[in-house]
From Swiss-Prot:
Compartments (UniProt record): Cytoplasm
GO molecular function: copper ion binding; DNA binding; DNA-binding transcription factor activity
Subunit structure: Homodimer.
Native source species: Rhizobium leguminosarum bv. viciae
GO cellular component labels: cytoplasm
DNA-binding region: 4-23
Major location category of this protein: cytoplasm
A Pfam entry, by short name: MerR-DNA-bind
Domain of life: Bacteria
GO biological process: positive regulation of DNA-templated transcription
Protein name as annotated: HTH-type transcriptional regulator HmrR
Keywords: Activator, Copper, Cytoplasm, DNA-binding, Repressor, Transcription, Transcription regulation
Annotated HTH merR-type domain residues: 1-68
SMART domains named among the record's database cross-references: HTH_MERR
């Protein structure tokens, strides 16, 4: 199938598919005319990559997960380690965002939001500069 059909079946834009090919995540066959010829296995890998990216895995983590998926002698512990590392990273980001939210919420409540020129939000931003 051509890249348009692979795009339609995988739900990924053609540009993303070409990028994944450029970085070696997929390797579609080339026909005698030089055009890419995507097989069902390529579309399956593209869907795998789409779901992996949707869960927040980096391109490099996707590369590792795809390699493990294709390795029938893999240890599930290796897959779990990658997922656990990502989960720890997500938890850290949630804590950071929660703290940012708390700070911003405090500043919003401290600001009168009226016609007066004084504003604790701007004062806080200025103090950090």
């Amino acid at each position: 199938m051509n890249i348009g059909e692979a795009s339609e079946r995988s739900g990924l834009p053609s540009k993303t598919i070409r990028y994944y090919e450029d970085i070696g995540l997929i390797r579609p066959e080339r026909g005698g005319n030089g055009y890419r010829d995507y097989a069902a296995t390529d579309v399956h890998k593209l869907r795998f990559l789409q779901r992996s990216r949707g869960l927040g895995f980096s391109v490099e983590e996707c590369r590792q997960l795809l390699a493990l998926y294709e390795d029938k002698d893999r240890a599930s512990a290796d897959v779990r380690d990658i997922a656990q590392t990502k989960l720890t990273e997500i938890d850290r980001k949630i804590r950071e965002l929660t703290e940012l939210r708390r700070t911003l919420e405090h500043l919003v409540h401290a600001c009168h939001g009226n016609d007066r020129p004084d504003c604790p939000i701007l004062e806080e931003l200025s103090d950090g500069a």
